[in-house]
From Swiss-Prot:
It is found in: Mitochondrion inner membrane. GO terms for molecular function: NADH dehydrogenase (ubiquinone) activity. One of its GO terms (cellular component) is mitochondrial inner membrane. The gene is MT-ND1. This is NADH-ubiquinone oxidoreductase chain 1.
Amino acid sequence: MTLSTLTSLMIMTLSYMIPILIAVAFLTLVERKILSYMQARKGPNIVGPFGLLQPIADGVKLFIKEPIRPSTSSPFLFILTPILALLLALTIWTPLPLPFPMTDLNLGLLFLLAMSSLTVYSLLWSGWASNSKYALIGALRAVAQTISYEVTLAIILLSTIMLSGNYTLSTLSITQEPMYLIFSSWPLTMMWYISTLAETNRAPFDLTEGESELVSGFNVEYAAGPFALFFLAEYANIMLMNTLTITLFLNPSFLSPPSELFSITLATKVLLLSSSFLWIRASYPRFRYDQLMHLLWKNFLPLTLAMCLWHTSMPISYAGLPPA
């Protein structure tokens, strides 16, 4: 491999990673602004005009601080897990059409599901490597919650594949040209949205970070740079899940607008959906753990299985009918 090829690959990778990281940084500012206005206060408004430079100031502050590691922790895993969390969070973006994917995979949805399952390891290892009971309990909660809700996410994706007829994410744009899939499969969309909240450990499903019980959950021993990496990974996953929701159910190719407007339309919809995540955080109290599991295993799982059977059987049933 020549030097020019390596350079071009590096530039391509950075050109898709840096905008995601910038968007994630400003999502934290949007969150603080929305929460502050909902609580009748101003929020960040000192650093830069209207507080716009606050995320940059926070990032600089965190990365120049000295990282502290507990003396009894596992040194290698303790440092590796935040890096792994951010690396996985950025890698999952590769097959998403924005409007063109970084890598056009035939099994894009399967890749997304497999990579999002791997994020469980970073949570579990961080809790175990910290050698703290609070961190370990938080990590075990996160693992149980994430694995549980991935079941419904996978079944909903399977139903969506039945509707679109392909695992490729680009096909969903063509499928949704006449009508958004949200109209034909709104129960799936509602369950998908709630499952993405649980998958990203956001309120009201933030059982892993219950301040009154576990101080800060799996990342309680992390400070400075490693904590910032976990923070970036969490918000990158939120944006990823919202982008995937838009791609699956509210694809930007509605009424075939010019391709130049695709990215703007997608970004606007993702921002609105991310704002609804923050609105829910400000509005709802935290679920009890048994309620969280009850919602999935006794409500969502039977419903999603029934919907999946419905979406599978309908094309087969209609295939035997004579043409009108």
